[in-house]
Amino acid sequence: MSSRVCPQRPVAKSSGDAKVLLIVSTYKPRAAVLAADVVNFLSIRGFQCHTIEYDGLNKESCARAGYMFAVSIGGDGTTLFAARCASPSGIPILAINLGRFGFIAPIEPRYWQQALSDYLAGGVRPAERALISCTVTRAGKEIASCLALNDVVLSSGRVARLTRAEVCFNDISFGVYEADGIILATPTGSTAYSAACGGPILDPDLDAFVLTPISALCLSNRPVVVPSSGVVRIKVLSMRHKETVLSVDGHELCTLQEEDQLLASRSSCSARLVFCTPHVFYHALCSKLAWSGSIFSRRGRRHDD
C-alpha cells in the first residue's frame, strides 16, 4: 500500500546519544526562530540536534542512518527535500508547515510542541508514502538517478516547444506523446502538477502511479493510472529544438538528448511521514483546494432556494 502505517515504539526521553535531524527552510521568515525553539525542546529531553539548511536549491544527500527522526520546518518543498534525504535510511519525518498548502507538512506551527510530545510518547505512527525510483540511461549507460516523492517531469526546456517521447509500461507501448511534457506522479504528487494538468487525484493508499501528458497535441493522449508494481519507460525521440529537461519534485535533474531513456518504478524504500493520515489527506483536499460543494451552500443558502 502507498500509505502503509508503520509500527511505532515509544521514543521516550533520550539518554543523550539519540540524534534528531532538523531540515530548515532559509526562505521562510519564521523558520530559524521556530527551529531554535525545537532544538531547545529536544535538547532538554536529551536529544542531539543536527541541522541542514534548505534554500530551495540544495542537492540532497542521503542522511546517515542513526537519526531517530527528522523534523522538517518549512513548506511542502522542504518536506519533499527532507523525504529524499531521509527516506533511504528509513528516518521518520515530522513536518511543520510554514508554507501555503501543507499537503505533506500537516503540523501547524502553533501545535508543534503537542505534535512532538505525542510522537515521543509513542502515540503516533508514521505512514509510508511511495517513492519513484528513476534512472536515466544514454547509450546503455546510466547518467543520472533520483528518488521522487511527488513526481518526475519530462518537458521542453523552451517555451512553446513540443517534446516527443515514446511511453511504455511493462514494455507495452502507449504510443508517441507529442506534448509540452509528461508527468509521472505518485499518489502523494497527484494533488500537485499532475492535478493542475487534468490528472486524477489518487488516494495515498493506492499502489499506483499516474501518467499525465501536459497539453498533448493529440486529444486522445489522456492521463493513465498504472500499478506501481510495473516499470514505466520513456524514450526521448527526435525533436527540432534538441532540448528536453527532466525535473524531480520541481527541481531540474538533467538535460536529456535524443534516444535517452528514463526508467521509473516504485522504490524499495518509502517516505515515512508522521501525521499524514488518510483523514488529514481528505481534510487537506477540502480545505486547501477549497472544495466546498454547492455554490449555494458556500453562501449559506438552502439548496432548494
From Swiss-Prot:
<dbReference type="GO" id="GO:0019674">
    <property type="term" value="P:NAD metabolic process"/>
</dbReference>
<dbReference type="GO" id="GO:0051287">
    <property type="term" value="F:NAD binding"/>
</dbReference>
<feature type="binding site">
    <location>
        <begin position="76"/>
        <end position="77"/>
    </location>
    <ligand>
        <name>NAD(+)</name>
    </ligand>
</feature>
<dbReference type="InterPro" id="IPR016064">
    <property type="entry name" value="NAD/diacylglycerol_kinase_sf"/>
</dbReference>
<dbReference type="InterPro" id="IPR017438">
    <property type="entry name" value="ATP-NAD_kinase_N"/>
</dbReference>
<feature type="binding site">
    <location>
        <position position="180"/>
    </location>
    <ligand>
        <name>NAD(+)</name>
    </ligand>
</feature>
<feature type="binding site">
    <location>
        <position position="161"/>
    </location>
    <ligand>
        <name>NAD(+)</name>
    </ligand>
</feature>
<dbReference type="GO" id="GO:0006741">
    <property type="term" value="P:NADP biosynthetic process"/>
</dbReference>
<keyword id="KW-0808">Transferase</keyword>
<dbReference type="InterPro" id="IPR017437">
    <property type="entry name" value="ATP-NAD_kinase_PpnK-typ_C"/>
</dbReference>
<keyword id="KW-0067">ATP-binding</keyword>
<dbReference type="GO" id="GO:0005524">
    <property type="term" value="F:ATP binding"/>
</dbReference>
<dbReference type="Pfam" id="PF01513">
    <property type="entry name" value="NAD_kinase"/>
</dbReference>
<dbReference type="GO" id="GO:0003951">
    <property type="term" value="F:NAD+ kinase activity"/>
</dbReference>
<keyword id="KW-0521">NADP</keyword>
<comment type="similarity">
    <text>Belongs to the NAD kinase family.</text>
</comment>
<dbReference type="GO" id="GO:0046872">
    <property type="term" value="F:metal ion binding"/>
</dbReference>
<dbReference type="Pfam" id="PF20143">
    <property type="entry name" value="NAD_kinase_C"/>
</dbReference>
<dbReference type="InterPro" id="IPR002504">
    <property type="entry name" value="NADK"/>
</dbReference>
<keyword id="KW-0520">NAD</keyword>
<comment type="function">
    <text>Involved in the regulation of the intracellular balance of NAD and NADP, and is a key enzyme in the biosynthesis of NADP. Catalyzes specifically the phosphorylation on 2'-hydroxyl of the adenosine moiety of NAD to yield NADP.</text>
</comment>
<dbReference type="GO" id="GO:0005737">
    <property type="term" value="C:cytoplasm"/>
</dbReference>
<keyword id="KW-0963">Cytoplasm</keyword>
<feature type="binding site">
    <location>
        <begin position="150"/>
        <end position="151"/>
    </location>
    <ligand>
        <name>NAD(+)</name>
    </ligand>
</feature>
<feature type="active site" description="Proton acceptor">
    <location>
        <position position="76"/>
    </location>
</feature>
<protein>
    <recommendedName>
        <fullName>NAD kinase</fullName>
        <ecNumber>2.7.1.23</ecNumber>
    </recommendedName>
</protein>
<keyword id="KW-0547">Nucleotide-binding</keyword>
<keyword id="KW-0418">Kinase</keyword>
